[in-house]
Design a protein with these regions (language model features):
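Short alpha-helical transmembrane segments in multi-pass integral membrane proteins
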Residues: 1-21, 79-146, 188-244, 300-365, ...
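N-terminal transmembrane alpha-helices
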Residues: 9-40, 44-45, 59-74, 78, ...
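Transmembrane helical elements of multi-pass membrane transporters/channels
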Residues: 19-38, 140, 174, 203-207, ...
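Interfacial/gating helices of multi-pass transporter permease domains
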Residues: 42-62, 128-133, 193-194, 235-242, ...
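Small-residue-rich hydrophobic transmembrane alpha-helices
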Residues: 51-111, 148-167, 261, 275-338, ...
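Hydrophobic transmembrane alpha-helices of multi-pass small-molecule transporters
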Residues: 63-66, 178-183, 208-212, 284-287, ...
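Short runs within selected transmembrane alpha-helices of multi-pass transporters and secretion channels
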Residues: 141-159, 167-175, 196-211, 290-293, ...
Length: 444
């Protein structure tokens, strides 16, 4: 534990922050690339019904990641505070609970999804034409649920021990396996939608195997050994108090996208298509910001647990400045090249024109989004469940829905486009107020 204490207590903060955050940013960008590669190979079949069928199944994937976050982020937030308090044995038990909790919920999800298959497919909007493909993709992903959900626990927890690079290697390994298997299963074996899903599941299995091996061989304070395992109700509560808000954030994102698409339907399909492209480009920027925000979480949690006010303050100051700087750079670069970015995906002039405007309006809220992300992360690290929950529900949920409704009435089409930026601004104001009030109460 000496090495670990050295890193978290002595290292200069910027160096330590980057050491923890860069691998997170990298893993997130890889997962995005691999989503795009998936889309590329599926589109390569030239079968629109198949492409649509797979797209309809993607919310299921988001749902699984959200569930994985309950144990992944909830467990690791608690573990980093315990490490700061030097309670290594307790941290080990929490890691065991999170690992098996994720397996159990994965099996439960698989069962529920299989039992209610036709009901869920209907809710997702599968039509007669797309049903067969959506169903194939859905079935494989549903059966792979335990493997997909479990992967998120070690990938988050290894960072609390300073193993950010190992966490990245595991995620990248899965993505690479998936990218190699995709064309083989979709085209060579001719499995189509089922092939794409199977490749995803096998990629996750490889990630799981690597993580379990690493935890057994290299990790001192995290474990997958179920022997002598016990956990109290208050400890389960501490994991869920942070894990559930984190998971709600993910679900809100899907809801936000769905609300925007529905609001745009009345303005024509080309607008919906343009927004689909803009969301993908915007996602790159958002993931970089999310990675830098969540990457520093083990450092914030550790210093909070260790009751080290000077170092906690320095960490937060650096986090806000770094995030703000990144947001401004992304706004400038993506905003300047907006039309060219949209053209990569579609060359239709009306889509390019609408898309460029949409992208610039989405980017307008980047700085505020950064403030919200760091604040949410600070609350998660400090075990402040309420603050984390309020912020995660607001930005793409409650505040966004209200802003969208009013903006649509007042300003029509342009109102819809500006909604996210307005919502980001309002949530950022809320974030600053909440963090300020919390910081005045921190008693060390």
């Amino acid at each position: 534990n000496k090495m670990q204490e050295e890193i978290f207590e002595k290292y200069p903060i910027p160096k330590e922050y980057f050491k923890l955050a860069l691998p997170v940013v990298f893993s997130m960008v890889i997962s995005l690339v691999y989503n795009m590669v998936d889309t590329y190979f599926i589109a390569g079949t030239g079968n629109t019904d198949l492409v649509a069928g797979v797209a309809l199944g993607s919310p299921i994937f988001t749902l699984m990641i959200a569930l994985g976050d309950i144990f992944g982020l909830g467990g690791s937030s608690f573990i980093s505070r315990l490490f700061g308090e030097k309670r290594y044995e307790d941290a080990k038990r929490i890691s065991v609970f999170s690992f098996y909790g994720a397996i159990v919920s994965g099996v439960a999800v698989a069962a529920v999804l299989m039992i209610f298959r036709s009901l869920v497919l209907g809710l997702l909007g599968a039509s007669e034409a797309t049903w067969e493909y959506a169903s194939q993709y859905y079935t494989c992903i549903a059966l792979g649920a335990p493997f997909i959900i479990v992967a998120l626990t070690p990938s988050n927890q290894l960072r609390t021990e300073g193993f950010a690079t190992a966490s990245m290697v595991g995620s990248v390994l899965g993505a690479v396996v998936n990218i190699i298997l995709d064309p083989i299963m979709i085209f060579v074996l001719g499995w189509g939608a089922a092939g794409a899903a199977t490749a995803t599941v096998i990629g996750n299995v490889c990630t799981d195997i690597f993580f379990v091996w690493f935890l057994i061989k290299k990790s001192k304070n995290l474990s997958v050994d179920p022997r002598g395992f016990h956990i109290s109700r208050s400890e389960i509560g501490a994991v869920f108090a942070i894990g559930i808000p984190a998971s709600v954030t993910n679900l809100m994102q899907s809801i936000g996208i769905a609300l925007t698409n529905r609001a745009l339907l009345g303005f024509g399909d080309d607008k919906v298509a343009a927004m689909g492209i803009v969301m993908k480009i915007n996602m790159i920027a958002a993931l970089v910001l999310v990675g830098f925000a969540f990457g520093g979480q083990p450092l914030t949690g550790y210093n909070y647990g260790a009751r080290n006010r000077t170092r906690l303050k320095a960490t937060l100051k650096f986090a806000y400045l770094l995030e703000g700087g990144m947001a401004l750079v992304l706004m400038a670069v993506l905003g300047f090249f907006a039309p060219q970015m949209v053209k990569i995906f579609m060359s239709d002039p009306s889509v390019v024109e609408n898309g460029a405007l949409m992208l610039r309006l989405q980017l307008a809220g980047m700085l505020c989004m950064g403030i919200v992300l760091i604040s949410t992360c600070t609350f998660q690290s400090a075990g402040q469940a309420m603050g984390a929950f309020l912020l995660s529900v607001s930005r793409q949920g409650v505040v966004f829905a209200v802003v969208l409704m009013i903006a649509l009435k007042v300003a029509g089409y342009h109102g819809v486009l500006a909604s996210q930026a307005i919502s980001d601004f309002l949530t950022a104001v809320l974030a600053v107020v909440l963090v300020w009030r919390w910081w005045k109460k921190v008693d060390f």
